[in-house]
From Swiss-Prot:
<dbReference type="GO" id="GO:0045122">
    <property type="term" value="P:aflatoxin biosynthetic process"/>
</dbReference>
<dbReference type="GO" id="GO:0016646">
    <property type="term" value="F:oxidoreductase activity, acting on the CH-NH group of donors, NAD or NADP as acceptor"/>
</dbReference>
<dbReference type="InterPro" id="IPR051606">
    <property type="entry name" value="Polyketide_Oxido-like"/>
</dbReference>
<comment type="pathway">
    <text>Mycotoxin biosynthesis; aflatoxin biosynthesis.</text>
</comment>
<dbReference type="Pfam" id="PF13460">
    <property type="entry name" value="NAD_binding_10"/>
</dbReference>
<keyword id="KW-0560">Oxidoreductase</keyword>
<protein>
    <recommendedName>
        <fullName>Averufin oxidase A</fullName>
        <ecNumber>1.-.-.-</ecNumber>
    </recommendedName>
</protein>
<comment type="similarity">
    <text>Belongs to the avfA family.</text>
</comment>
<comment type="function">
    <text>Involved in the conversion of averufin (AVF) to versiconal hemiacetal acetate (VHA) in the aflatoxin biosynthesis pathway.</text>
</comment>
<dbReference type="InterPro" id="IPR016040">
    <property type="entry name" value="NAD(P)-bd_dom"/>
</dbReference>
<dbReference type="InterPro" id="IPR036291">
    <property type="entry name" value="NAD(P)-bd_dom_sf"/>
</dbReference>
Length: 282
């Protein structure tokens, strides 16, 4: 039996993956789901507890709880990492903290299982903005604005990806990075068409339903993509809603601007104090 682990199943990405697996799952699949709120998950998927194909096991806990993670990751060949922070709050470390916790649990499994240990594949949601080939398709000024506004979120994701890369070199895991464009229609349930890409042209928008289907395809074809970034582009119509995205950009940009101003104020203060002391000594 194939076992998939899903972290963050109540968010838009995790829900789309779970919905796709429930409707088009491979034969003999077991899904181990880690969520902060089992009640919230069952409200979104009321038939989950009676589902027999695939088998579903729900664990309530956080993505940094070693006991919950150990139960969720046990025997998993695929780990969908969909835990994410809404917006881009300064100092966020959710992704990197989760990555460290996952790697720690996998290290323990590797040590206990010895030669029989089989590394799982982490399917990590990233962003086309962090993929040089795909980011180059966006006007430079737009890319700079987005990178500035979402600096904290991107820094967190990049650090998590560095941890996965280091762990791969140690034989602890494999990883695949999934790079979609802007994501829309969080409540939509029907995919309208997508395609996996490398450096080809990428549409501006993608639905969450198509992202979920794409991540499931990537998991099915995991051996083709180990250690690589995979882009996703829409081939069908996408119901676009820019309000939430623009709000995240505005909030992230405002926070980043305040941080920059505060840093410059501190530097100016230190320089001024140094000059005062220097003048006094002279």
């Amino acid at each position: 039996m194939v076992t998939y682990a899903l972290l963050g199943a109540t968010g838009a990405t995790g829900s789309s993956i779970l919905r796709h697996l429930l409707h088009e799952s491979p034969d003999s699949l077991r899904i181990q789901i880690l969520v902060r709120s089992k009640v919230k998950l069952l409200q979104a998927f009321p038939n989950l507890q009676t589902t027999r194909n695939p088998q579903v096991h729900v664990i309530q806990g956080t993505s940094t709880d070693p006991d919950a993670l150990s139960e969720c990751l046990r025997n998993a060949s695929i780990v969908f990492m969909c835990v994410a922070q809404n917006g881009s709050p300064i100092g966020t470390t959710l992704c990197q903290d989760s990555a460290r916790a996952i790697i720690s649990v996998l290290q323990q499994q590797q040590q206990s299982q010895g030669a029989s240990y089989q590394p799982c594949t982490i399917v990590q949601l990233r962003s086309a903005s962090l993929n040089p080939a795909l980011a180059a398709q966006v006007p430079a000024f737009v890319h700079r604005i987005v990178s500035f506004c979402l600096f904290a979120n991107y820094a967190d994701i990049k650090k998590a990806c560095q941890y996965y890369s280091q762990a791969q070199k140690q034989g602890i895991l494999e990883y695949i990075l999934v790079d979609p464009p802007t994501l829309h229609d969080a409540n939509g349930t029907q995919p309208t068409g997508y395609r996996l890409i490398s450096t080809e042209s990428q549409a501006t928008a993608l639905s969450y339903a198509d992202l979920g289907a794409a991540m499931c395809e990537i998991a099915h074809r995991q051996s083709e993509f180990h250690g690589r970034a995979v882009g996703v582009t829409a081939t069908g119509r996408v119901r676009q809603a820019w309000g939430v995205l623009l709000r995240h950009l505005l909030e992230g940009g405002s926070a980043r601007l305040r941080e920059k101003i505060a840093q410059e104020t501190v530097v100016d203060g230190v320089v001024f104090a140094f000059l005062v002391v220097l003048a006094y000594l002279m």
